[in-house]
Amino acid sequence: MIQAETAAAAWDGRVLRLLAERENRVFQIALPDGRFAALRLHRPSYRDAGVIRSELWWCAALAEAGLPVPVPLPTKNGDLLHSIGPDHHASALSWIEGIPVGKGGTALAGDAEAQVRLFAAIGRLLARLHNETDRLTPPPTFTLPRWDAAGFIGRAPRWGRFWDHPQLSPAEAARFHDARAFLRDRLSHAESQADIGPIHADVLRENVFVNGGSLSLIDFDDSGIGFRGYDLGTALSQNLYEPAYPALRQALLDGYAETRPSDPELVDALLLARCLASVGWMITRLAPDDPAHSRFIDRAMLCIAQVLG
């Protein structure tokens, strides 16, 4: 908390509470004018200053275009990024009102009809995100990590070598290797013709806020350059066990297709890429005895069965 208080001082802010602790530690702070803001202490060495500044530029440009996303807030010195140590940075974003549409690992709220409406709205929001992004002209310094074939299934994937997870059984490891081979072929061929550009890359329930009838999108800290369909696949990844999953998938695709085309089969492949990447993500971030390991491996196995048969 002391580190957060020191960082908050760059905005003359007062720390109220810890909100989340994943790639970033996120705190709610109060600003001198009475507004709330989200203070992010970025995970050291996960993203360098140039990447974080690019993410902040993108969010600011999207907000200016009318997208419901957080607005980066300058420090009292006028900078959007504040250094709190070697390779360790802080940033602050405008407060987004509302609540998450759900939480991973729990049943999605609402009846099937309400869930379908929600996913159609998420599809429309993601299409708008991609459409508005394509109208922007990034500065020469704009740089984001690549969510491409190498980023998912290369020798050093962005989130780790999922196929080397120490808790995989021999049968699971074999299926993971099959899935990796499938993705290598599918994504490598798709890279030359797929819709590729800046993506949010973490469209989980926790990152989609609802306030009344409106949706907002938060937490761009995994954003990168990649397959646009990955945003759709990620939005589906927490819902594979939902009874209405086929209808949710179709509603998401239909909502997106109202203003932007997609490739449903590629979306399914990218859904698989996300489920596998999440297994790799846990290897270095969770304790070996954390039950989430088995849950995420089981989910990846379910997704492999759905996509590969």
Question: What are these model-predicted stretches?
Answer:
Residues 1-13:
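Juxta-kinase regulatory segment immediately upstream of eukaryotic protein kinase catalytic domains
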Residues 17-20:
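Protein kinase glycine-rich loop
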Residues 23-30, 38, 72, 184-230:
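Active-site acidic catalytic loop and adjacent metal/ATP-binding pocket
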Residues 32-137:
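ATP-binding pocket architecture of kinase catalytic cores
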Residues 109-171, 194:
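A cross-family kinase active-site recognition segment
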Residues 117, 262-272:
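All-alpha amphipathic helical-bundle segments outside canonical DNA-binding/catalytic cores
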Residues 228-260, 274-290:
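Active-site activation/catalytic loop segments of kinase-like enzymes and analogous catalytic loops
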Residues 280-309:
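ATP/Mg2+ or Mg2+-diphosphate-binding catalytic cores
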